[in-house]
Amino acid sequence: MNMFFRLTALAGLLAIAGQTFAVEDITRADQIPVLKEETQHATVSERVTSRFTRSHYRQFDLDQAFSAKIFDRYLNLLDYSHNVLLASDVEQFAKKKTELGDELRSGKLDVFYDLYNLAQKRRFERYQYALSVLEKPMDFTGNDTYNLDRSKAPWPKNEAELNALWDSKVKFDELSLKLTGKTDKEIRETLTRRYKFAIRRLAQTNSEDVFSLAMTAFAREIDPHTNYLSPRNTEQFNTEMSLSLEGIGAVLQMDDDYTVINSMVAGGPAAKSKAISVGDKIVGVGQTGKPMVDVIGWRLDDVVALIKGPKGSKVRLEILPAGKGTKTRTVTLTRERIRLEDRAVKMSVKTVGKEKVGVLDIPGFYVGLTDDVKVQLQKLEKQNVSSVIIDLRSNGGGALTEAVSLSGLFIPAGPIVQVRDNNGKVREDSDTDGQVFYKGPLVVLVDRFSASASEIFAAAMQDYGRALVVGEPTFGKGTVQQYRSLNRIYDQMLRPEWPALGSVQYTIQKFYRVNGGSTQRKGVTPDIIMPTGNEETETGEKFEDNALPWDSIDAATYVKSGDLTAFEPELLKEHNARIAKDPEFQNIMKDIARFNAMKDKRNIVSLNYAVREKENNEDDATRLARLNERFKREGKPELKKLDDLPKDYQEPDPYLDETVNIALDLAKLEKARPAEQPAPVK
């Protein structure tokens, strides 16, 4: 679900259809619950600890030194910006930092819960202070600055230092709204709602939130890709992997205290009803034979849990239509199995002159991906495309089996990836069918967010000489995770009152290319590297403080299905000539230069209105000029101001456009080359 918060002017009290909906403000610290472990958490902690210490690839001792590291990670997860807790708070609990291993083994998580409860109290105090700051006159004429990233800053020594940090935070929030054109009155109203909303959320925190954070600190200290998944996150994970769920087919978001329809899945129950529209608010949820439950002010995940249910069952929604002065209405929907098509492979065809290039955009390696790609390749074959692009940008991976089977569509047979466990045992995962589903020119487009299964596929295509890889160096995740439920068959017999216990993902293996190299930390280096607008940002495995190291093993025995190295000089020459003249890439290069010039200052922003307005005006002027240059090239009328830009305007994708050109060049070169006999590689 999409759980971001939009700030709009909504009345805190609405009289609707004869009912009064109100959400109580939290004005005292004692209204925030003191959170304690639930009965099942001790057992879950014991099972998680046992699983990680016995089975994780990185063999570690849960000793005092490791416990101290868990404490530090938990502390930073709890107060990332170091602007909630005091240094004395940290020192108070640091005395017990070496005891966390014992707590995890026993399941008695006192330090985790006590520290969380203190942070809740401190966070309440901070937002109460922020509300008091709003009453002061606003002054944006000084030389104050605001640090956007305090993750490495020391914790404040006293309340005066803490107040100074929040003076700057409130001033930053005020100035951000003032730059949008809001009046001082509107700014105060908006921020008052925002801060009170944050306080109400404190009162909705539950024991599972604390437990999840504790387990996350433990898991992430072992390596970046080891996770504890709460029962609800486990359900979400299964949905992502299968691309299906049972529900009403709507994406929800929070808007102050309201659950709002953000979008609807075409063909789903919500869309088919024609009684629900984007922007409508869900104020009540009712199950068959049960009264309607008022959900105003509820956590989004709690509302979602009420709405979802088995296929064929009914759910009643009390809907407040978008707009003012409207009455609620009740809509009854029958839940269905919903396929999340927006996460499935998408096919498109790019036409350049008389040539066509097929593009397969793959957002993730879900179960069933290979079968879906086969269908799309058949469609592309009917359109007589000259080449195919596999777009793996922002693809974070997924099922290892799908990476292997997808690779098998493009080579006759052979190993795709080598997998090694922590005992040194190496396994080859291979394609064995001896068939090639697509034999034409192939290009793989990647970026720094292409990870894991994406890197397995890209590396295999590169090592076999089957495809040209273009884009950015990839993320560098070269590890394999295993997913295990924490439930036991006997749990429901012995403890029927327990909910589901969640699951864990933990690293059990590292994978290696067929050439023996690892993608861990280094990723896959493209044959043609594209310039990007955010050069050297801290994205990738190598920036994780506890990532497993890079290493290599012996190469597998495999038969290359092609060799594109002879083409690379010509392809690179044509590519460089094009982007040197391409206005979009010229702008990208300017952005790179600007980013690099400002990278040491990018987290420090001015709190002076004139300075920020000048910066914003310059940015707007640059964007408007670039848009008008583009429109002029396209023969479209120029814009007078940015507000005239249509809301549905689609920005061009210069990286994909250039990849299409590279694919056409590759197709021409391959067509002109005589067939060669492949040779085995050892």
From Swiss-Prot:
Changing K477R: Loss of activity. Perturbs protein structure. Its EC number is 3.4.21.102. Changing D463A: Loss of activity. Changing D463N: Reduces activity by 90%. Residues 635-650 have a biased composition (Basic and acidic residues). One of its GO terms (cellular component) is plasma membrane. Changing G398A: Loss of activity. Perturbs protein structure. Residues 238-322 form the PDZ domain. Residues 1-22 form the signal peptide. Gene3D superfamilies: 2-enoyl-CoA Hydratase, Chain A, domain 1 (3.90.226.10), 2.30.42.10, 3.30.750.44. Its main location: membrane. Changing E455A: Loss of activity. Perturbs protein structure. Transmembrane segments: none annotated. Residues 635-654 are annotated as: Disordered. Disulfide bonds: none annotated. Keywords: Cell inner membrane, Cell membrane, Hydrolase, Membrane, Protease, Serine protease, Signal. Coiled coil: none annotated. SUPFAM superfamilies: ClpP/crotonase, PDZ domain-like. It is found in: Cell inner membrane. The active site is at S452, D463, K477. Involved in the cleavage of a C-terminal peptide of 11 residues from the precursor form of penicillin-binding protein 3 (PBP3). May be involved in protection of the bacterium from thermal and osmotic stresses. This is Tail-specific protease. It comes from Escherichia coli (strain K12). The gene is prc.
